[in-house]
Swiss-Prot record:
PTM statement from Swiss-Prot or TrEMBL: Deacetylation by SIRT1 or SIRT2 stimulates interaction of FOXO3 with SKP2 and facilitates SCF(SKP2)-mediated FOXO3 ubiquitination and proteasomal degradation. Deacetylation by SIRT2 stimulates FOXO3-mediated transcriptional activity in response to oxidative stress. Deacetylated by SIRT3. Deacetylation by SIRT3 stimulates FOXO3-mediated mtDNA transcriptional activity in response to metabolic stress. In the presence of survival factors such as IGF1, phosphorylated on Thr-32 and Ser-252 by AKT1/PKB. This phosphorylated form then interacts with 14-3-3 proteins and is retained in the cytoplasm. Survival factor withdrawal induces dephosphorylation and promotes translocation to the nucleus where the dephosphorylated protein induces transcription of target genes and triggers apoptosis. Although AKT1/PKB doesn't appear to phosphorylate Ser-314 directly, it may activate other kinases that trigger phosphorylation at this residue.
GO BP term (any one): positive regulation of hydrogen peroxide-mediated programmed cell death
Start-end of Low complexity biased regions: 110-129
Subunit structure: Upon metabolic stress, forms a complex composed of FOXO3, SIRT3 and mitochondrial RNA polymerase POLRMT; the complex is recruited to mtDNA in a SIRT3-dependent manner. Also forms a complex composed of FOXO3, SIRT3, TFAM and POLRMT. Interacts with SIRT2; the interaction occurs independently of SIRT2 deacetylase activity. Interacts with YWHAB/14-3-3-beta and YWHAZ/14-3-3-zeta, which are required for cytosolic sequestration. Upon oxidative stress, interacts with STK4/MST1, which disrupts interaction with YWHAB/14-3-3-beta and leads to nuclear translocation. Interacts with PIM1.
Organism listed in the record: Mus musculus
Protein name per the record: Forkhead box protein O3
Membrane association type: Peripheral membrane protein
Keyword terms: Acetylation, Activator, Apoptosis, Cytoplasm, DNA-binding, Membrane, Methylation, Mitochondrion, Mitochondrion outer membrane, Nucleus, Phosphoprotein, Proto-oncogene, Transcription, Transcription regulation, Ubl conjugation
Residue positions where N6-acetyllysine is found in the record: 241
C-alpha cells in the first residue's frame, strides 16, 4: 500500500483494483456489497463486527464514492482494502469507524466529522507511510442520517430517491416543487448529480425521480393554478411515511385512491359471496360477480345466461325444428321420406324458389307424373291453355315423367303426354294441362306438398278417354286437389302473406261462384286467372250456363287427349294470346315461360281457382261438342313453347328436384 497515491485526490476504482497491495482472495464479494460477510465480521482486532463488515464491504463502494462523492463510505472502502491486505488492521478499522460515522457517529476524528458534515473530503492517514485521501466532495453524506450499517444504499449515500425528494421539497419555502425544480435541486445539492444534469446523463436518475414521485404515497401532486404549468409536488401530510414507502403499482383502476372504497366494498361482497357456497362456487373472481357480466358464474346469473342461450337455440335455429321458413330449402331433404311437410312454411317460398316444387314435392311427383303419363295427349294439343294454367300454378317447370315429354313446364310437376314425345312445341304442351293428367298438373304447389305432399292437381286421374269432370273429381287426385284448394289458403298464408291473401280471395270467389272467381282472378293479375276466365267464358257459352270453371276443367280433363288439347288451345287462345304477351314480356319466350318465371302467381292462383267444389254442379258436359264448337276454332293460335318443352329445365323456376326418375314412380292416381 506504500505505492498507493498519497495525494488527497480520490482514488479511481481502477487504481484501487490494480494496487498490488490488494489481494482478490480477501474480498470475494460479487453482487453482495450491501450484505455483511460473516468472515469479515469475525476478523480479529476489529472494534466491532459492524465496523469490520463496513471496513470490508464498502471497499469497492469507496471506488464508487470516489467517483460519486459519497464521503462516508469511501473512507471505509479504502480502509477495507487495507484491512484485507498488509495494512495494519487496527489503525485502518479505527479510522474506518471514524470515517463511517458521519454526522451521527462522531468518533472524534476530524475527517469523520467532516464527512458527517458533508465535507468529509480530507485525506486520512491510515498509516504513517500511507495517507489515504478521503476526498468526499459528496454532499450526499450529509444529506441523510447514516444507517446503523454504514454500507451505502446508493451511489450518493444512504438516502433513497424518496429521501432526496423529501429533502428537496422541504427545503423549498412553500414546501412544494415542480418536477423540474426537483431536478434542479438534485443537481445543485447532491454532488453525485452535479455532473449529471445534462439531458444525456440525467435520463436515468430523472426517470427514477419521476417513478418515486408517482409510486410513493408520501408525495402528492397538486394541480398548478397556472396555465400550462407542471403540477406541484408536495409532501403528503397523511400518507407520508419516513423512509421509502413500500412499492406499489402505478395508479390505475385497481389501486387508485379513487377506487379504494369501491374495491373495499367489492372485497367484502366477494367474501360474503364466497361464504355462501351456492354463489361462491363458480365465482373465481369478483368480476364474475358483476350482475351484468356474461362471465358471471353465480348460480342465478349462470342460469339466466344459459336460459338465454337455450332460447337462442330454439327450433327456429335448428334444421330439425321445421319452424324456420329460412331453413325450408335445407329441410326439404328431411321431408322427402315423410308423408308431408309438417309446416307450410317450409314450402311457402315464392314460386321461383318454390320449395314446394323442391324435394318434398318430389315424393308426390311420381304419382303426378304417372297420372300425366296415363294421359295420352296428342302432340297437337294446344299449349297456350297449358301455359296459362301453368303460369297460374307458378310451379317450376317440371320434367316429363313419361317418355312423352314435358307437357307442363309451368306446373311444378311434369305434365308430359305419353303420346309421341314432347309433341309439337305449341300444341302438346297446353293440351296436357287440360288432359286428365293436366288437371293433376294444374297445381302442385307448396300448398299441395303441405297437404300430405299429394298433388292437389286438378288432373282427372281418369284415362285418356273422354271423361266427365265427375270422373276426374272421383279420382284421388281430384280429392287431393279439393283438399289442397280448401286448405291451400291458410297454408299459403303461413308461407306467404301475399299468396295467402290472393288464395283466400280466389277460393272464396271460386266457392261462391266460378264466374266470380275467375273474374276476381284477372283482377289479381294472374295469367292463369285471365286464361281461365277466357276459357270459362268460352266454355260457359258452349255449355250454356254450366259453371265456367267446371266446363273448362271438364273440357280439359274429360275430352280426349287430342280433343282436349285442341279445346284447350282454343279456350286459351284468346286468354293465352293476351297472356302470352304478358308472359313473353315476363319470360321473354312464351306463356309457359312466363308461368315459370312467375311461379308465385301460378302457385298462388291456379289451385285456388280450380277449387273442386265448383265442379260439383255441372260435371256433365259434352266436351266433344264444346271442343268442336269453340275450342277447335282456335287452331290458328301460334304459341312457340319449343324451347320450354324441349328443355325440361328451361325456366329458372324449373327445380332439379323434379327429375324424370322421380316422375317415374309406380304410384298412379288414375282411377281406371
Amino acid at each position: 500500500m506504500a505505492e498507493a497515491p498519497a495525494s488527497p485526490v480520490p482514488l479511481s476504482p481502477l487504481e484501487v483494483e490494480l494496487d498490488p497491495e490488494f489481494e482478490p482472495q480477501s474480498r470475494p464479494r460479487s453482487c453482495t456489497w450491501p450484505l455483511q460477510r460473516p468472515e469479515l465480521q469475525a476478523s480479529p482486532a476489529k472494534p466491532s463486527g459492524e465496523t469490520a463488515a463496513d471496513s470490508m464491504i464498502p471497499e469497492e463502494d469507496d471506488d464508487e464514492d470516489d467517483e460519486d462523492g459519497g464521503g462516508r463510505a469511501s473512507s471505509a472502502m479504502v480502509i477495507g482494502g487495507g484491512v484485507s491486505s498488509t495494512l495494519g488492521s487496527g489503525l485502518l478499522l479505527e479510522d474506518s469507524a471514524m470515517l463511517l460515522a458521519p454526522g451521527g457517529q462522531d468518533l472524534g476524528s476530524g475527517p469523520a466529522s467532516a464527512a458527517g458534515a458533508l465535507s468529509g473530503g480530507t485525506p486520512t492517514q491510515l498509516q504513517p507511510q500511507q495517507p489515504l485521501p478521503q476526498p468526499q466532495p459528496g454532499a450526499a453524506g450529509g444529506s441523510g442520517q447514516p444507517r446503523k450499517c454504514s454500507s451505502r444504499r446508493n451511489a450518493w449515500g444512504n438516502l433513497s430517491y424518496a429521501d432526496l425528494i423529501t429533502r428537496a421539497i422541504e427545503s423549498s419555502p412553500d414546501k412544494r416543487l415542480t418536477l423540474s425544480q426537483i431536478y434542479e435541486w438534485m443537481v445543485r445539492c447532491v454532488p453525485y448529480f452535479k455532473d449529471k444534469g445534462d439531458s444525456n446523463s440525467s435520463a436515468g436518475w430523472k426517470n427514477s425521480i419521476r417513478h418515486n414521485l408517482s409510486l410513493h404515497s408520501r408525495f402528492m401532486r397538486v394541480q398548478n393554478e397556472g396555465t400550462g404549468k407542471s403540477s406541484w409536488w408536495i409532501i403528503n401530510p397523511d400518507g407520508g411515511k419516513s423512509g421509502k414507502a413500500p412499492r406499489r403499482r402505478a395508479v390505475s383502476m385497481d389501486n387508485s385512491n379513487k377506487y379504494t372504497k369501491s374495491r373495499g366494498r367489492a372485497a367484502k361482497k366477494k367474501a360474503a359471496l364466497q361464504a355462501a357456497p351456492e354463489s361462491a362456487d363458480d365465482s373465481p373472481s369478483q368480476l364474475s360477480k358483476w350482475p351484468g357480466s356474461p362471465t358471471s358464474r353465480s348460480s342465478d346469473e349462470l342460469d339466466a345466461w344459459t336460459d338465454f342461450r337455450s332460447r337462442t337455440n330454439s327450433n327456429a335455429s335448428t334444421v330439425s325444428g321445421r319452424l324456420s321458413p329460412i331453413l325450408a330449402s335445407t329441410e326439404l331433404d328431411d321431408v322427402q321420406d315423410d308423408d308431408g311437410p309438417l309446416s307450410p312454411m317450409l314450402y311457402s317460398s315464392s314460386a321461383s324458389l318454390s320449395p314446394s316444387v323442391s324435394k318434398p314435392c318430389t315424393v308426390e311427383l311420381p304419382r303426378l307424373t304417372d297420372m300425366a303419363g296415363t294421359m295420352n295427349l296428342n302432340d297437337g294439343l294446344a299449349e297456350n291453355l297449358m301455359d296459362d294454367l301453368l303460369d297460374n300454378i307458378a310451379l317450376p317447370p317440371s320434367q316429363p315423367s313419361p317418355p312423352g315429354g314435358l307437357m307442363q313446364r309451368g306446373s311444378s310437376f311434369p305434365y308430359t303426354a305419353k303420346s309421341s314425345g314432347l309433341g309439337s312445341p305449341t300444341g302438346s304442351f297446353n293440351s296436357t294441362v287440360f288432359g286428365p293428367s293436366s288437371l293433376n298438373s294444374l297445381r302442385q304447389s307448396p300448398m299441395q306438398t303441405i297437404q300430405e305432399n299429394r298433388p292437389a292437381t286438378f288432373s282427372s286421374v281418369s284415362h285418356y278417354g273422354n271423361q266427365t269432370l265427375q270422373d276426374l273429381l272421383a279420382s284421388d287426385s281430384l280429392s287431393h286437389s279439393d283438399v289442397m284448394m280448401t286448405q291451400s289458403d291458410p297454408l299459403m298464408s303461413q308461407a306467404s302473406t301475399a299468396v295467402s291473401a290472393q288464395n283466400a280471395r280466389r277460393n272464396v270467389m271460386l266457392r261462391n261462384d266460378p264466374m266470380m272467381s275467375f273474374a276476381a282472378q284477372p283482377t289479381q293479375g294472374s295469367l292463369v286467372n285471365q286464361n281461365l276466365l277466357h276459357h270459362q267464358h268460352q266454355t260457359q257459352g258452349a255449355l250454356g250456363g254450366s259453371r265456367a270453371l267446371s266446363n273448362s276443367v271438364s273440357n280439359m280433363g274429360l275430352s280426349d287427349s287430342s280433343s282436349l288439347g285442341s279445346a284447350k288451345h282454343q279456350q286459351q287462345s284468346p286468354a293465352s294470346q293476351s297472356m302470352q304477351t304478358l308472359s313473353d314480356s315476363l319470360s321473354g319466350s312464351s306463356l309457359y315461360s312466363a308461368s315459370a318465371n312467375l311461379p308465385v302467381m301460378g302457385h298462388d292462383k291456379f289451385p285456388s281457382d280450380l277449387d273442386l267444389d265448383m265442379f260439383n254442379g255441372s260435371l256433365e258436359c259434352d266436351m266433344e261438342s264444346i271442343i268442336r264448337s269453340e275450342l277447335m276454332d282456335a287452331d290458328g293460335l301460334d304459341f312457340n313453347f319449343d324451347s320450354l318443352i324441349s328443355t325440361q329445365n328451361v325456366v329458372g323456376l324449373n327445380v332439379g328436384n323434379f327429375t324424370g326418375a322421380k316422375q317415374a314412380s309406380s304410384q298412379s292416381w288414375v282411377p281406371g
